[in-house]
């Protein structure tokens, strides 16, 4: 190689070289040309190239800037070119990472006035624990009260929130709607008046009557309730229902009369009238308790310390004792406990003798409560609201309250809150009330176990739970499921009743259908992490002893609603805790389906999740294949659908118009004895149906009477209360369709006519057929209600082979249907009880709106000490859709209503009257309603339009009907 031809960098610097290139043009010539022509062309092109290098014309389409796909990837790789973008513009090319977040949670543990170690230490001492549910009517101040407790224990929280805290409204939907939807547990350490600390497990519950199932879940794991009542509104619809519910759950009841500032600042009542108003509320609550409770000692009074007064908005809370303590601290040398006993009722202070008397010393004397509590309170509020600049600093100095100049410049509300906070201090009165009147988990365990545990209280397990023994066998009752921040998984929330639950521990989860005989509904799981829940943050712990509330990870998969968690081995006799018994019924029904049918599995998964999330929600599949959701009201189902669409399935879902569930009943006794033969013609059952006595169905549903009682006790109940004869009362076989179902099956056969031993051998099969029949009535596949079925005769085959369940069960069901159809069947619809609050000038508009929806008013009275009226009414549930919106429109938004299921009522008209023609898109007159409801319900369920009796009557039975010349409206 000649080095002179290249420079030091290796670049060629020698003379120009001749072009040596092989001609590429050959490939472009057509194959038809002969070789000679090709050679000539080659020579020409070669000459041209040599003569004019770089001057050839290359067409645009022949230019080549990049290698082809085949050259890059090789001939084996198929390449596809798409000239149109198939991805929609709405979808990003690179999707961002999505983080789902549906709850407001703290990122780090906030600063508290107590150490977390001291909270953990208190968990081991069950006598210093109180498990309390705060409940009350809508907007009576429960959440705001918890905010005050959070503020008291978390000094830095209020600095980060300018608006109302609403610390327990952790869902974004709750914040947006301004109403509580879920029960939220909060665990805090609070001091009493003497400075002793207690661990409070507080459940803040929704006040809306639709969400009373959340209250039920909270009550089950509590030992007592604090009932919140708005001082201005008094006892409302939900207040009354909650008193009844708490008494039925055998819980200690205390009352907090909240928003007392409204009496002063809003209603502007004089102090004496304010006292009368407060006393009226206490008397009303006591009247309701005496109505529902058998315990005559259960009385509420400020003198007993189980009533406290508060204003959450202005950080006021006191009992008579805590207010008396303020006097003792200010003036000294006062026995505040004795002083407190003289601060309620018709007791007066005589300033001359300096003694308390029951008689007013002068005509202008005020009661002690007015003089020592209300008047100072009025003065403080009036000073702050009225004269801030001149006399307020002097008044505050007298009270020992010192404010900075910046604080004195605050707006009225924050200033009033600050002054009251400094004057009243911490909420020690509330703590005193709960400590004295709500039992600790150790004291409250025995009545709790007796009421909720299905097993024996006398067993070793029962005794361990009654003693709240942290070293005993593990028993934990979960009543709520809380979804994680992203809505993917659930954590179970419950109370440890005995033993200690550890993180990472293997446990056995028993479902609601678990029994010792049938252990199918149980599963072994491993506990994940454990937390103590404080609304927006969780404190992780490695163990939780008996008496405490706990949030458990890793056991959610087998749990649907409630569960019992126990040890996997050595606890074989463990039985379950009773499923929750709700104080309302789900009667509103909506059908759902995905917009895109291929997304059905996602919707089903979402339905399973909402079913876990809402305690009283029911989801089921009709025979027509449609998926149905049952809820308590419109707001409830609206929240369910929001969660289903946005949180759990993330798909578009179509919803049908809401409808209601119906019931089927009879109004007369069967016109003739109805019988049915088994398919093998070797057995025959004869029955009649008749209506139950009024009130009996409700007694069965409320468990006033139970089928598990012995025959003697059962007989006595029916004899004394419902005037049954002894033979019939002792011959009750079953309630249907379940143990608390509102129908009764009675064996009315005579030993002289029927072989009782043979009949007894098929009793279980007949009961099963009866329960199947009452679960799905013949009119429109709805529950049968209020019907007594009597077995009058039975022919039973001698050989066991010929009287098996396969023969007897469907036959018993058919005879139940035929007896039912012969007893003048009717439809029943659910009725709502409606409570409307409205100013006096809007009352007539409320009457008008109700009348248009088949509703009627039962009571219309002014609320004492306020400008509002309360209107109580009934309205059919099927006509209640949109009622609230309609009412607001007619009253310019001044009326506020709440409605809740109350009772079942017979729909006017005969559902089987074929002479009625249902005209489409026309409202039907009242006598046609039953027929319309039945036909439309059957159509929706995919059933034939009319009831076909050939299904339910055998040929011999039809012959019998012909002989009796019974005219039937039913199609054959």
Curated annotation (Swiss-Prot):
The modification Phosphothreonine is found at residue 86. There is a cross-link at residue 64 (Glycyl lysine isopeptide (Lys-Gly) (interchain with G-Cter in SUMO2)). The modification Phosphoserine is found at residue 19. It is found in: Nucleus. The modification N-acetylmethionine is found at residue 1. GTP binds at residues 136-143, 204-208, 258-261. InterPro entries: EFG_II, EFG_III/V, EFG_V-like, EFTu-like_2, EFTUD2_N, P-loop_NTPase, Ribosomal_Su5_D2-typ_SF, Ribsml_uS5_D2-typ_fold_subgr. It comes from the Eukaryota. GO terms for cellular component: cytosol; nucleus; U2-type catalytic step 2 spliceosome; U2-type precatalytic spliceosome; U4/U6 x U5 tri-snRNP complex. SMART domains: EFG_C, EFG_IV. Residues 17-26, 34-48 have a biased composition (Acidic residues). There is a cross-link at residue 64 (Glycyl lysine isopeptide (Lys-Gly) (interchain with G-Cter in SUMO1)). Keywords: Acetylation, GTP-binding, Isopeptide bond, mRNA processing, mRNA splicing, Nucleotide-binding, Nucleus, Phosphoprotein, Spliceosome, Ubl conjugation. The keyword Acetylation applies. Residues 1-53 are annotated as: Disordered. Disulfide bonds: none annotated. GO terms for molecular function: GTP binding; GTPase activity; U5 snRNA binding. One of its GO terms (biological process) is mRNA splicing, via spliceosome. Required for pre-mRNA splicing as component of the spliceosome, including pre-catalytic, catalytic and post-catalytic spliceosomal complexes. Component of the U5 snRNP and the U4/U6-U5 tri-snRNP complex, a building block of the spliceosome. As a component of the minor spliceosome, involved in the splicing of U12-type introns in pre-mRNAs. Component of the U5 snRNP and the U4/U6-U5 tri-snRNP complex, a building block of the spliceosome. The U4/U6-U5 tri-snRNP complex is composed of the U4, U6 and U5 snRNAs and at least PRPF3, PRPF4, PRPF6, PRPF8, PRPF31, SNRNP200, TXNL4A, SNRNP40, DDX23, CD2BP2, PPIH, SNU13, EFTUD2, SART1 and USP39. Component of the pre-catalytic, catalytic and post-catalytic spliceosome complexes. Component of the minor spliceosome, which splices U12-type introns. Within this complex, interacts with CRIPT. Interacts with ERBB4 and PRPF8. Interacts with PIH1D1. PANTHER family: 116 KDA U5 SMALL NUCLEAR RIBONUCLEOPROTEIN COMPONENT, TRANSLATION ELONGATION FACTOR-RELATED. Belongs to the TRAFAC class translation factor GTPase superfamily. Classic translation factor GTPase family. EF-G/EF-2 subfamily. This is 116 kDa U5 small nuclear ribonucleoprotein component. It comes from Bos taurus (Bovine). The gene is EFTUD2.
């Amino acid at each position: 190689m000649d080095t002179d031809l290249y420079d030091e960098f290796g670049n060629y610097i020698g003379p120009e070289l001749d072009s040596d290139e092989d001609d590429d043009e050959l490939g472009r010539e057509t194959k038809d040309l002969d070789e000679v022509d090709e050679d000539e062309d080659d020579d020409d092109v070669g000459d041209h190239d040599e003569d004019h290098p770089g001057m050839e014309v290359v067409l645009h389409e022949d230019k080549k800037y990049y290698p082809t796909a085949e050259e890059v990837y090789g001939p084996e790789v198929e390449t596809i070119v798409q000239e149109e973008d198939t991805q929609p513009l709405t979808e990003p090319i690179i999707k961002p990472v999505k983080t789902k977040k549906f709850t407001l949670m703290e990122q780090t543990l906030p600063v508290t006035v107590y150490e977390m170690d001291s909270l953990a230490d208190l968990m081991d001492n069950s006598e210093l624990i109180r498990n309390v549910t705060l409940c009350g009517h809508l907007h009576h101040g429960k959440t705001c009260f918890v905010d005050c407790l959070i503020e008291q224990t978390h000094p830095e929280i209020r600095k980060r929130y300018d608006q109302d805290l609403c610390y327990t409204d952790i869902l974004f939907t709750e914040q947006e709607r301004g109403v509580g939807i879920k029960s939220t547990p909060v665990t805090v350490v609070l001091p009493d008046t003497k400075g002793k600390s207690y661990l409070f497990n507080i459940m803040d519950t929704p006040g809306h009557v639709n969400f009373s199932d959340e209250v039920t879940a909270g009550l089950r794991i509590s030992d007592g309730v604090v009932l919140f009542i708005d001082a201005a509104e008094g006892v409302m619809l939900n207040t009354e229902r909650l008193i009844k519910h708490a008494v039925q759950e055998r819980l200690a009841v205390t009352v907090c009369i909240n928003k007392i500032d409204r009496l002063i600042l809003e209603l502007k009542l004089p102090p004496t009238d304010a006292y009368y108003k407060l006393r009226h509320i206490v008397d009303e609550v006591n009247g309701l308790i005496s109505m529902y409770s058998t315990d005559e000692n259960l009385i509420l009074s400020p003198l007993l310390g189980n009533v406290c007064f508060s204003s959450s908005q202005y950080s006021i809370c006191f009992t008579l004792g805590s207010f008396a303590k303020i006097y003792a601290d200010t003036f000294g040398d006062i026995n505040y406990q004795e002083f407190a006993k003289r601060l309620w009722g018709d007791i007066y202070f005589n300033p001359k003798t300096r003694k308390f008397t029951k008689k007013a010393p002068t005509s202008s004397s005020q009661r002690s409560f007015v003089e020592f509590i209300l008047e100072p309170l009025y003065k403080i509020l009036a000073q702050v609201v009225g004269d801030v600049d001149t006399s307020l600093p002097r008044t505050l100095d007298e009270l020992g309250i010192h404010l900075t100049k910046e604080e004195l410049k605050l707006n009225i509300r924050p200033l009033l809150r600050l002054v009251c906070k400094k004057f009243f201090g911490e909420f020690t009165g509330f703590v005193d009330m709960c400590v004295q009147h709500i039992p600790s988990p150790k004291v409250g365990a025995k009545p709790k176990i007796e009421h909720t545990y299905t097993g024996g209280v006398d067993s070793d397990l029962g005794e361990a739970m009654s003693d709240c023994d942290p070293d005993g066998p593990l028993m934990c009752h979960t009543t709520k499921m809380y979804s994680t921040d992203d809505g993917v998984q659930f954590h179970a929330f419950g109370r440890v009743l005995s033993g200690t639950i550890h993180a990472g521990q293997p446990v056995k989860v028993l479902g609601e259908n678990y029994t010792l005989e049938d252990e199918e509904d149980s599963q072994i799981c491993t506990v994940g992490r454990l937390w103590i829940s404080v609304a927006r943050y969780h404190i992780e712990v490695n163990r939780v002893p008996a008496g405490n509330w706990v949030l458990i990870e890793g056991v959610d998969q087998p749990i649907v609603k409630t569960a019992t968690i126990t040890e996997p081995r050595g606890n074989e006799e463990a039985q379950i805790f009773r499923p929750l018994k709700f104080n309302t019924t789900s009667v509103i029904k909506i059908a759902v389906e995905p917009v895109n049918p291929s997304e059905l599995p996602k919707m089903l998964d979402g339905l399973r999740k909402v079913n876990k999330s809402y305690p009283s929600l029911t989801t089921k599949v009709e025979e027509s294949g449609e998926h149905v959701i049952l809820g308590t009201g419109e707001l409830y189902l609206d929240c369910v659908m929001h969660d289903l669409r946005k949180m759990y399935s993330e798909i578009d879902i179509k919803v049908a118009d809401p409808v209601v569930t119906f019931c089927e009943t009879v109004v007369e006794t069967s016109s003739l004895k109805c019988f049915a033969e088994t398919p093998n013609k070797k057995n025959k059952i004869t029955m009649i149906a008749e209506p139950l006595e009024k009130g009996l169905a409700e007694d069965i549903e409320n468990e006033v009477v139970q089928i598990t009682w012995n025959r003697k006790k059962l007989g006595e109940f029916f004899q004394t209360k419902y005037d049954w004869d002894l033979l019939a009362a002792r011959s009750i076989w079953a309630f249907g369709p379940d143990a608390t179902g509102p129908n009764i099956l009675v064996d009315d056969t005579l030993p002289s006519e029927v072989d009782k031993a043979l009949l007894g051998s098929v009793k279980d099969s007949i009961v099963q057929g009866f329960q199947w029949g009452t679960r799905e009535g013949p009119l429109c596949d709805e529950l049968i209600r209020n019907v007594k079925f009597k077995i009058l005769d039975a022919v039973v085959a001698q050989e066991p082979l010929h009287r098996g369940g396969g023969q007897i069960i469907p036959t018993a069901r058919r005879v139940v249907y035929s007896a039912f159809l012969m007893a003048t069947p009717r439809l029943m619809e659910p009725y709502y009880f409606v409570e409307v609050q409205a100013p006096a000038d809007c009352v007539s508009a409320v009457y008008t709106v109700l009348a248009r929806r088949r509703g009627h008013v039962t009571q219309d009275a002014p609320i004492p000490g306020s400008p509002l009226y309360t209107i109580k009414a009934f309205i059919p549930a099927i006509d209640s859709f949109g009622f609230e919106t309609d009412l607001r429109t007619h009253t310019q938004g001044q009326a506020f209503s709440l409605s809740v299921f109350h009772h079942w009522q017979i729909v006017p008209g005969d559902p089987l009257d074929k002479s009625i023609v249902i005209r489409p898109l026309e409202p039907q007159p009242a006598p046609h309603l039953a027929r319309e409801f039945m036909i439309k319900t059957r159509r929706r369920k995919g059933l034939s339009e009319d009831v076909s009796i050939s299904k339910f009557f055998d040929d011999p039975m039809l012959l019998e009907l012909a002989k009796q010349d019974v005219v039937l409206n039913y199609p054959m």
